[in-house]
Amino acid sequence: MHIETPLNGDESVLSENAAAQPIRKSYVHGLSNVALLFDTVGDRLRMAADQVPNREFVIFKRDGIRKTYQQLLHDCEKFATGLIHLGLDRGDRVGMWGPNTYEWIVCQFGTALAGMIMVNINPSYQSEELKFALEKVGIKALIAPPGFKKSNYYASVSDIIPELILKPEGRGEMSSHNFPNFRHFIIIDDQKAYRGAWKYSEVIKMGSEEDRIKLADMERQVQPDDPVNIQYTSGTTGFPKGATLTHHNVVNNAYFIGRRAGYSEKRTIICVPNPLYHCFGCVMGSLNACIHLQTCVFPAPSFEPLAALQAIHEERCTTVYGTPTMFIDMLNHPRYSEFDYSSVFSGFVAGAPCPIALCRRLVQELGMRDLQVCYGTTETSPVSYMSVRDDPPEERIKSVGHIMDHLESAIVGNDGTVLPRGERGEVLVRGYSVMRCYWDSEDMTKTEITPDRWYHTGDIGVMHENGTVSIVGRKKDLIVRGGENIYPTEVEQYLFRHPKIEDVQIVGVPDERYGEVVCAWIRLSEEAKNITEQDIRDFCKGRIAHFKIPRYILFKGEKDFPLTVSGKVKKYEMRERSKIELGLQQVKPRIDHFNGEWTFDVQAERHPPKEQKLNGENTGRLFDVTAGVESLVQ
């Protein structure tokens, strides 16, 4: 039998699979009486431009650009016809390499209109990483500014495509020996002409009447199940994998994210300091806003805490997005108190474990009474679990929420067995949101997605009796100390209770006797400079298990924590830096790690869930998010 728990009134329900048995399995299915959409990204842009043509869709504060839905649609059509004029067709891959700019949005929706596939390229990539990105998916056209911050994009392209500098200025057609699919380089700079590069401002003027007719024909042929976006994802280590997402994947995920957040109910102005190249920015941000006819505010080309605070104040933003690190930097900015945040009533926190103390501050100081936590991965378009606004605040931050509508999820052991609720295992997801594949990586796709379409997230989670899930860590981040399993998130959550700790990250470092021991990176508040390592250990003694107390404590500054562009901490880099700083590079454990409470073999063969038959549609990492177990309100 099923027990169905309403979400948001009568809009959707959760199946808790409460079979008449003593042990309930860690499986949920997001039943819903709201149908999936069968639209393309282009369909939704045209619908928005028809319904609210004069409403502002995107605001880029730093560049002084404000565009309505009708204006964006017009610009997207000009951009698409320009690409068609250059010879691009349906299915061709178009790389977008750069920070948050209006041209990024035009590329996102313009390529979707024409049935082309946009490839998101990390703004921090250097020449070797760009080379891999171009080769892996066969990019035909690349769009980028001349550079950003310390990166010289034009020099990087010239480095891997030397033919570039042999071309005339302002001419971007290309035939490269190293990149046989590559044909055009388009540069976003009106002030200067570059050898081997078209000016973006010229490309959007190239389209002829014949090109416009062809665009209309191409648009009619685009299907919801066609790929629309390739997002390179490797978590925080390893070679990038091209997660291939369809219109159906991202349109529906954005739609149900917005419904659960209440965007379909009232006017919403979303502050998006997150990078557009990441799912948080381009699916939860721009596409979500488009589908629900709302407005996105982009404070700066990349995250700047002061710019975000100013944007909230000046644009009267109602919702703010961010990772915990972003919110910490915003709340602790010396000019934080200068601005008015009374317009804010909601926000999304995702990207890393969210400390209870931070959640409390977001509600009490920034006004996020409808704060919601999200969990998912790029491969799931991205959100799989999300808080429900009807839950009390203290319940919302105990977990990553409920399964999204129309999705299934299970927690399994290392052999694929669905575990009882309350036991830790790997989180699996199945449904419309699961990516099509990793582009041109059949073996890798088979490793991550089982034949019956269960996607292995690589995250360790526990399902509670009410069907919500808490993420306790990544399989690869698990610390095994003499057979005892230590989940970094648990130690981090405890240490965050210390009133003088502003940020903390836990990693494992090698130890001869135990195999691994705990190392803590700690950032103290300004007034806490006299705190010692022993003070931290004393804070832990008698409150957490002795084997979880950090052996090593490294006090760090704000800039010392290595972050990805999307705000995730690079734990693998922290581990390596810790070993060097502590002189542990040559340490070899004298014993093999033995199985403790529950140990994962990261390389183990992956299995679909077994022991229990899981039914459902086989249709078909942004966020490693969790919260603690304290109450939000004391």
Where are these regions (language model features)?
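Conserved ATP/PPi-binding loop(s) of AMP-dependent carboxylate-activating enzymes
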Residues: 402-406, 417-448, 484-486, 581
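Structural core segment of the AMP-binding/adenylate-forming
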Residues: 2-10, 116-202, 526
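Conserved AMP-binding/adenylate-forming core of the ANL superfamily
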Residues: 33, 37, 57-109, 126-131, ...
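Conserved AMP-binding/adenylation subdomain of ANL enzymes
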Residues: 251-269, 279-319, 329, 333
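Conserved adenylate-forming
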Residues: 86-88, 207-226, 230-272, 284, ...
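AMP-binding/adenylate-forming catalytic core of the ANL superfamily
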Residues: 125-132, 142-144, 320, 431, ...
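Conserved C-terminal "lid"/linker of ANL adenylate-forming enzymes
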Residues: 184, 479, 505-511, 519-523, ...
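Gly/Ser/Thr-rich phosphate-binding loop
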Residues: 202-206, 317-322, 331-395, 408, ...
